[in-house]
Amino acid sequence: MLSIPEFYQGKNVLITGATGFMGKVLLEKLLRSCPNTKAVYVLVRHKAGQKPRERVAEMMSCKLFDKLRDEQPDCAQKVIAISSELTQPELDMSKEDQDTLIDCIDIVFHCAATVRFNESLRDAMQLNVIATRQLLYLAQKMKKLEVFIHVSTAYANCNRKQIEEVVYPPPVDPKKLIESLEWMDDSLVNDITPKLIGDRPNTYTYTKALAEYVVQQEGSKLNIAIVRPSIVGASWKEPFPGWIDNFNGPSGLFIAAGKGILRTMRASNNAVADLIPVDVVVNTTLAAAWYSGVNRPKNMLVYNCTTGGTNPFHWGEVEYHVISTFKRNPLEQAFRRPNVNLTSNHLLYHYWIAVSHKAPALLYDVYLRITGRSPRMMKTITRLHRAMMLLEYFTSNSWVWNNENTNMLMSQLSPEDKKVFNFDVRQLHWAEYMENYCMGTKKYVLNEEMSGLPAARKHLNKLRNIRYGFNTILVVLIWRVFIARSQMARNIWYFVVSMCFKFLSYFRASSTMRY
């Protein structure tokens, strides 16, 4: 059987979502570990006045591609930008570009999707479902196509507690929903959205479930596989540990915790935190395309790319490692010392929100106003609470995913491919991974230099001293007010003080008698 690099040798590959987090890592890994890949076509839209080619050039100049550029200085010549807008009819692609792709593409990786949990149903359907269908129509015309890989999510069927590696019946016929959306106005769509998504938490998981069904139905004549990653996090090993470049998912919460802004969150300490490193997802995806391309299985394979079943990690452990890492290696200009309390109790959660989030933010904004600056902390807290609300469904529940196909895929790799395209999460050491993840947010998201650590530690110690001083003054003031108004409190206070003096006198007397 061909090795994975041999399979990709001489192949033309198409990637959607190549400028996204996972797409970048997929592109880098493909070019670096399969150096004889002929060309990689990436669908990119115009953005902020930049042409697709300029966006790709800028992307490939970032730190993620440093190792690739060192090994293959001319690697950028293999990457061909195709102007495309996935939300437009026929992907807004020129006839010339369509003909090029139809004539030469061997492998398709469809990674593009909206990952915003609060996206409107219309927009989520457009990118996650309709764009997928249009890409499948284009793929059906490709003369040399060997395999089509659709990247979904392990939470597409989160309304089930036990999730098999199969495509489940959709909650509604995608075709009928698409037709209905054409005549509905936005107000009506928003009104019916809660009824449509039912027991799913958001439009993202709902539309990803519909997209899987579309892939199964519309791509029945194609050689297709689906990869379902869970919560995609920073890189484990490749191209280096801790690579992360966005605030999405848990990354933004980790940063908020490190800054001392996030103090409480609704979550179950014992719920499984099914984090999956991005390089594990990429290696699984490349291996899935190899297996389907070489063996051409009769049925479409689905791979649940998760960690909970083989190497479980819990949200309570996540909280511990995040806080301990940021206490040792603090972020610059922290608002408060890192400390987070996870709770699943509704009343306790709202109490801590008021005491630990809103009250300090309000006081800080008052201080900013007094000093002539613009208040900003309450706005930050409001944005943080929105993000927390979107994630609490996933931090409060656990799921069981079947991983038989993923384990089978791993067993089919040669010893060399297992080293180069490793996705065995049993080898993942969570404490080390979480430290690299947190440090990755510091270095690559916030762009903080490690040389600034001494100053950051000094600032954290200053915050600790301020906290101790404030708490001491607060306790003394409250106690003094309480004593002044209550005879019983005064009696207790005098009794405690007298007992302390008696104890000290006894201690001194006993010490003197020894000599």
UniProtKB/Swiss-Prot annotation:
GO terms for biological process: ether lipid biosynthetic process; long-chain fatty-acyl-CoA metabolic process; wax biosynthetic process. Catalyzes the reduction of saturated and unsaturated C16 or C18 fatty acyl-CoA to fatty alcohols. It plays an essential role in the production of ether lipids/plasmalogens which synthesis requires fatty alcohols. In parallel, it is also required for wax monoesters production since fatty alcohols also constitute a substrate for their synthesis. Residues 1-465 are cytoplasmic. InterPro entries: FAR, FAR_C, Far_NAD-bd, NAD(P)-bd_dom_sf. Residues 485-515 are peroxisomal. It is found in: Peroxisome membrane. SUPFAM superfamilies: NAD(P)-binding Rossmann-fold domains. Its main location: membrane. The chain crosses the membrane at residues 466-484. It catalyses: a long-chain fatty acyl-CoA + 2 NADPH + 2 H(+) = a long-chain primary fatty alcohol + 2 NADP(+) + CoA; hexadecanoyl-CoA + 2 NADPH + 2 H(+) = hexadecan-1-ol + 2 NADP(+) + CoA; octadecanoyl-CoA + 2 NADPH + 2 H(+) = octadecan-1-ol + 2 NADP(+) + CoA; (9Z)-octadecenoyl-CoA + 2 NADPH + 2 H(+) = (9Z)-octadecen-1-ol + 2 NADP(+) + CoA. The gene is far1. This is Fatty acyl-CoA reductase 1. Pfam families: NAD_binding_4, Sterile. Keywords: Lipid biosynthesis, Lipid metabolism, Membrane, NADP, Oxidoreductase, Peroxisome, Transmembrane, Transmembrane helix. Its EC number is 1.2.1.84. The keyword Cytoplasm does not apply. It is an enzyme of class 1 (oxidoreductase). Belongs to the fatty acyl-CoA reductase family. It comes from the Eukaryota. It is a single-pass membrane protein. GO terms for cellular component: peroxisomal membrane; peroxisome. GO terms for molecular function: alcohol-forming long-chain fatty acyl-CoA reductase activity; alcohol-forming very long-chain fatty acyl-CoA reductase activity.
